[in-house]
């Protein structure tokens, strides 16, 4: 049961830092490349979730890198 709950949490939280840094105003902090990873590392109050989210944010940010190059810094 615990494994199922953890699996669901990881799936729902995957790439959370990437989504937050791109969509919520003020959370990008001027980062253009890998804003989700930088958001996770910077000052996340959810340190235990950051450990789970960081690899997913890294993959998600890498997939969105071509878009980030043309978009410019996220504010």
Swiss-Prot record:
It comes from Escherichia coli (strain K12). This is Uncharacterized protein YceK. GO terms for biological process: DNA damage response. InterPro entries: DUF1375. The keyword Signal applies. To E.coli YidQ. Residues 1-21 form the signal peptide. Keywords: Signal. Pfam families: DUF1375.
């Amino acid at each position: 049961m615990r494994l199922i709950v953890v699996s669901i949490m990881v799936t729902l939280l995957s790439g959370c830092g990437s989504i937050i840094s791109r969509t919520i105003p003020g959370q990008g902090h001027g980062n253009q490349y890998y804003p989700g990873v930088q958001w996770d590392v910077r000052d996340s109050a959810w340190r235990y979730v950051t450990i789970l989210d960081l690899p997913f944010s890294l993959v998600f940010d890498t997939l969105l890198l071509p878009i980030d190059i043309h978009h410019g810094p996220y504010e």
